[in-house]
Amino acid sequence: FADKVKGILEMYLGGQNIGTAEKALLFGEANPSGKLAETFPEKLSHNPSYLNFPGNMDDVDYAEGIFVGYRYYDEKGINPLFPFGHGLSYTTFEYSNLTVSENEIKDDKTLTVMVDVTNTGDRDGMEIVQLYVSDKESSVRRPVRELKGFEKLFLKAGETKKAVFHLDKRSFAYYEPDIHDWFVEYGEFIIEAGSSSRDIRLSTSVYVSSDTKLPVHFTLNTTCGEINSIPEGRAMFENILSQIDCGFGDTASDDLGASAKEMMEAMIRDMPLRTLVTFTNVPDITRAKMSEMVENLNEMLAEK
């Protein structure tokens, strides 16, 4: 019936005087301003825990990891019945002038975010402004967006107020097991202001950097792509590629050969270093030489 009515009043656990509150809202004596603190899926099977709950005997597997609630529906591209943060009002609100205090900050600093909200209707009302952050260039899997703050503003009809948010290191960080702490990866972060997780009104961006370095230690089980991911390892990766090219001959003499070379390089990026030793037509790549290159690279990184 949800698509056949103009509105649904969700009262949750309203308490002893819930009837008085319902009357005030239904007859327009008060303006509703609540927002959903959860996602309402269209089907039970859309729930992120559908395949794992209630588990096996006494064990429950929380396989959804960090992708719970709106994070799961955003990642999967599933349209929910009602999204996280959704809520209607008897008036309307317009968002404008989303600004950040800095365009680039260090992770030990605090970023101030401000957005103007205007009551564009003819009734007084309250709006809950939601602020989401997204890591645009993350090397680890993170949610499409994460709620990092919200502000409730009371606005008279036609009035404009400013919602102010303060984002610290935790607002941009993810938990990194290698350092047993929260870690901010350098890159661009998208700042979004919206009325719900699916009703994003404005966005801007900021670059965040950190002096914290993740420990790096390579072995023969490290892939060539991981070696190539850091500046110190790129020379080693290029050396490996050049030796393989020599072993296989000139693979780039025509368009077909160029495609084959590109495909081989992509394949090599996913190979552990120990696998390269099996290339019998590349005699210069031996286990001993690979071990020496890895040891030299680790020593170089340790000196930094």
What would you call each of these model-derived segments?
Residues 101-104, 168, 219-226, 259-267, ...:
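Short, solvent-exposed coil/turn linker segments
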Residues 12, 29-30, 40, 74, ...:
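Sec/Tat-exported extracytoplasmic proteins
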Residues 1-124, 186, 192-193:
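Secreted, periplasmic, or luminal enzymes acting at the cell surface/secretory milieu
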Residues 18, 79, 120-126, 198, ...:
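Intrinsically disordered or highly flexible coil/loop and linker segments, enriched in small
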Residues 209-229:
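Low-complexity, Pro/Ser/Thr- and charge-rich linker/hinge segments at domain boundaries
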Residues 46, 67, 76-77, 89-215:
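Intrinsically disordered, low-complexity Ser/Thr/Gly-rich stretches
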Residues 243-304:
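Extended, compositionally biased non-globular segments
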